[in-house]
A protein has these predicted regions:
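S-adenosylmethionine
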Residues: 1-336
Length: 336
């Protein structure tokens, strides 16, 4: 078969896959299921078909959903245009491991760029298997997720270890960031999903981190507060609109109704977390969204209660770095 015929064949398969995709299954899993059921596609076929599919979704960025809800801090033309290119793969070297990680990448002959003190950027398709010991030597973490450490550093440490809670632990990346940035803290970890928490525990163990507690907690509902914390790092559920360069299928149809549902969920979570913070303690609220409703508006509501003072907030811009765009705000609790 000629190159043109190969491309035409792949284009036809990709067109069919895109037409039949209805969500909510992540498109990457949808593709994986299709390829598992159609063994005729070899490795090169799979890569070509996948690339054509994702190129289609990236072109949808010209009609990025709910543009009128995007924060004024975002340069919309630059942000939407960034979806035409695949984001980079970022890794963060653990404390004391940068030179080891750099040497390992060089030995493997991988193309990479060293950024700042601890970060390396690689092409998204790079494989790190058998090159570095993930979680022990370095963690895969977007450069702007790493940048949230700049807000962590605004929290004053005391002689007595701070009692810290990561209530939306997911895969454990934030917990590792907390311990790498604030080594002395007493870290408590939870998530609503037991299976996710199991994987989180495994990852923390690989990172050499033993949390003070690790348990399933549903913070979308009222819960018994057995003790208050010096600091809570709430990575709030959100639209994920700052990361759609990695999952461009989401550009297809995200609605105002979905955004409203998400903001109400965020409000519930923040309402339930507020009493769990000591007076004088801190809350770091973060999202991977570019929508003002999920970010500045939520922070304004917290400040309006009279119970919190805003210390700092910012968008961590990714469209100039081939990275995700995140939002973070650090607040101090002033009253119950």
């Amino acid at each position: 078969m000629t190159i043109d015929k190969y491309h035409h064949s792949h284009q036809n398969v990709a067109d069919k896959l895109v037409r039949e995709y209805e969500g909510p299954t992540p498109f990457a899993l949808y593709l994986k299921t299709y390829f598992a059921a159609n063994k005729k596609h070899g490795s090169k076929d799979r890569k070509s078909i996948s690339a054509i599919c994702y190129e289609y979704f990236r072109k949808l960025s010209e009609a990025f959903p709910l543009r009128n809800f995007i924060s004024s801090s975002i340069d919309i033309p630059k942000f939407t245009a960034s979806h035409l290119q695949q984001p980079l793969l970022f890794i963060r070297a653990r404390p004391g491991k940068k030179e080891l990680v750099k040497a390992s990448l060089e030995k493997a002959g991988l193309f990479f760029e060293s950024i700042g003190e601890m970060t390396f950027a690689l092409p998204n398709t790079s494989s790190l298997q058998n090159i570095i010991v993930l979680n022990k030597e370095a963690v895969i973490q977007d450069i702007n997720s790493q940048a949230l450490a700049s807000l962590l550093k605004l929290i004053p440490l005391t002689e007595k270890p701070l009692v810290v809670w990561d209530p939306c632990a997911a895969s454990g990346g934030k917990s590792i960031l907390i311990k790498d940035t604030m080594p002395s803290v007493q870290l408590h970890v939870s998530d609503i999903r037991e299976n996710i928490l199991f994987n989180c525990e495994k990852r923390l163990k690989e990172a050499g981190i033993q949390p003070a507690s690790l348990q399933v907690v549903d913070i979308t509902l009222p819960f018994a507060i057995k003790k208050q914390f010096d600091f809570i790092f709430a990575d709030l559920p959100c639209s994920g609109s700052g990361t759609w360069g990695r999952t461009p299928e989401n550009l297809q149809a995200y609605t105002e109704a979905q955004l409203n549902t998400m903001t109400k969920l965020q409000e519930n979570i923040l309402h339930h977390l507020m009493p769990a913070i000591k007076i004088g303690g801190y809350l770091l609220a973060a999202t991977c969204s570019v929508y003002k409703n999920e970010n500045e508006d939520q922070i304004e509501k917290l400040v309006a209660t009279g119970k919190f003072k805003l210390i700092a907030q910012q968008y961590f811009i990714g469209y100039d770095k081939h990275a995700d765009t995140l939002f973070g705000a650090l607040l101090q609790k002033m009253a119950d």
